[in-house]
A protein has these predicted regions:
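Residue-level recognition of single "structural anchor" positions
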Residues: 1-199
Length: 199
């Protein structure tokens, strides 16, 4: 589906921006509700990663936890769907419960070398890593290129917005997740999925 700005929608529909904002907010709330229902992953090959959204990187601060940014955790089933959520931080204590709640034991998980992923094997997963800090981005089938493709897509979308409050950020994030997951659907199917799927 097309991804118009509010100004473009206003020009097409002749509605004022306040009305458009109200309608879009209702749609995003519905999308967020549906996204939670779709977010359970079956067994398979899953890529997991984190990314940071928001303020520009502060000089002198590098890596995970860069000041002023919002941490987002993501899981992508290869040849399937993505799930993303805002997290307080990217520690093992925060990420492991999400992983265990979304991915069945016995699945194969691909990650980078972040220490929060230590212990996945002990929790019943097959775990393969690539070490970006050693300029390793793929080893055979082991890589996180799929989830990184989603991060690139999401950040291109967010570059259009001039700052978002925390509650609006989450809704836009789930909209981005939904658009990615249904990117091959035609518009009619997309609208039907949002508004006519039973709770």
């Amino acid at each position: 589906s097309e991804d118009f700005t509010i100004l473009q929608i206003a020009k097409i529909t002749k509605l004022n921006r306040k009305t458009i904002n109200f309608i879009l907010n209702k749609i995003r709330i519905r999308i967020s509700e549906l996204a939670e229902k779709e977010s359970y992953f079956t067994q398979g090959e899953i890529e997991i990663d984190e990314s940071y959204f928001g303020a520009r990187r502060v000089r002198g601060r590098r890596g995970r936890g860069a000041a002023g940014k919002t941490p987002v955790f993501g899981l992508l089933k290869r040849n399937g769907k993505v799930f993303v959520t805002v997290v307080p931080n990217c520690s093992r204590e925060e990420l492991m419960p999400i992983i265990q709640g979304k991915i069945l034991e016995g699945s194969t998980i691909h990650t980078d070398g972040w220490k929060a992923y230590d212990g996945l094997i002990l929790n019943g997963y097959n775990h393969y890593r690539v070490f970006h800090h050693e300029n390793e981005f793929a080893r055979g089938k082991s890589h996180v290129n799929g989830i990184e493709c989603f991060w690139s897509y999401a950040k291109r979308r967010f570059s259009k917005f001039n700052g978002l409050t925390d509650d609006k950020f989450i809704l836009h994030l789930k909209e981005t997740e939904c658009r990615f997951n249904h990117r091959s659907d035609d518009f009619a199917s997309f609208i039907e999925h949002i508004f006519f799927i039973k709770n």
